[in-house]
Amino acid sequence: MKEILIIIILGIVEGITEFFPISSNGHLILINYIFNIDKENIQNIIKIIQIGPIFSIILLFKEKIKKSITFFYFNINNIKKKLILILFNLVLSCIPISILGFMFYKKLEEFYSPKYISYFLILGSIFFILSEFISLKKIKIDNFKKISFLKYFIIGSSQCFSLLPGVSRLGITISIGLILNIDRYVLFKFSMILFSSIMPAVLILEVYKNFFYLKENIFFVIIGVMSSFLTSLIFGRTAIKIMKNTSLIIFAIYRIFIACIILFTCN
């Protein structure tokens, strides 16, 4: 019963934190140390329960996805060059983090400790605050079509930093994008698209690597995934509204607070 409760808590935390630049991995690993979960088990669970938010993101943006599919199906011979470039740039943005993730995933696991998480939470927060001040009073790019090839590539490359637990994929996307003069809501949507594009490949790799563990613990895996899916689906629309206009400084303060708690309680 205790194990089921912990898995549900992990799923709820994943479902909420995935929509904010506060590092879902950092929070899940903090819970690991609170409940004293085996390190190997928590890493397996963290990666697998991210399936939930992926499905919720697809459902939350289903109308836009449906329109895109309909457009391609009925207008295959009339696709505008600009749209093709946008899709190409989105795919290109996934490449840097995919390559580094596959090459160094073993090495990156060494950073899954409270000490490193707290350091990366603080460093990320400092960068978030700086990005808000750098982008102050600039006219923002408010459409995917206006984002240049170079800016797509820079944002995509910056995703590599989010491989470090505590940095936040969403946070690094928005902060780099703000510096590049892009609207924060456009960046939020872009980050969600990147997440739903990259994570399926990562999850396939994790299932392959941990097949026997997952097979033996399939009941807990299902509970964790369902918990994260339902939470992110219920909370997703509210999170989207919050992220439209909320400064990264608010989240940076929270991250520093969490980092201090981790430093003083988990080390």
Curated annotation (Swiss-Prot):
Keywords: Antibiotic resistance, Cell membrane, Cell shape, Cell wall biogenesis/degradation, Hydrolase, Membrane, Peptidoglycan synthesis, Transmembrane, Transmembrane helix
Keyword Zinc: no
GO molecular function, one term: undecaprenyl-diphosphatase activity
Family: Belongs to the UppP family.
Listed PANTHER family: UNDECAPRENYL-DIPHOSPHATASE
Miscellaneous notes: Bacitracin is thought to be involved in the inhibition of peptidoglycan synthesis by sequestering undecaprenyl diphosphate, thereby reducing the pool of lipid carrier available.
Protein name: Undecaprenyl-diphosphatase
